[in-house]
Amino acid sequence: MLVAAQLYKEEITRKLRATWYDLKYQYFWQGGCEDIDIPNNNYWKKQFAFLDNEGNVTGYFSYNYCPEANSINNFGLISFIDYNPRLIQAVIKHLENALSQGHINRIEFFAYEDNPANQGYQKMIKRFGGKQVGKLTKCSRLLDGKLHDTVFYEIFREDYLKKNWSKCDGWRREKE
């Protein structure tokens, strides 16, 4: 279950610090580590802790919100356990709700091309009617000391609704 990160600020900070020098988290940290700011509001940045059935924090999800463009960008997604499919399901449901209910019109994010999670991002992009819109080659040096390619993705609400119209009450209302 996704809940406000502000409720678990100390635990999230401690768990994130524990990942700083672990190579498997290099794609989240992008070559450098510092404490994540979890402010006492959620106007520009939405931040969530993911809780398992026992109430343990097993993941963190965040994004920036731009009210002028009604869009979100700059995702942060990290699991503190190796296998966490419920976290992914919760994130996808959150994004689907935001798109289908009209809370946002656009999603953009990037990923390192060789990140194992990128395969999942590509499936999500296809499912949501989005597309890869760019690629930068050898643009970021990560913890492994290598330069990595970055790919950029974009999803528009209207494309999501066309692809997933049967799930979206808002789409049916717009068509009437």
Question: Where are the regions a protein language model picked out?
Answer:
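Active-site rim helix/loop that mediates acceptor-substrate recognition in acyltransferases
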Residues: 26-52
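Acyl-donor (CoA/ACP) binding surface of acyl/acetyltransferases
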Residues: 1-18, 47-176
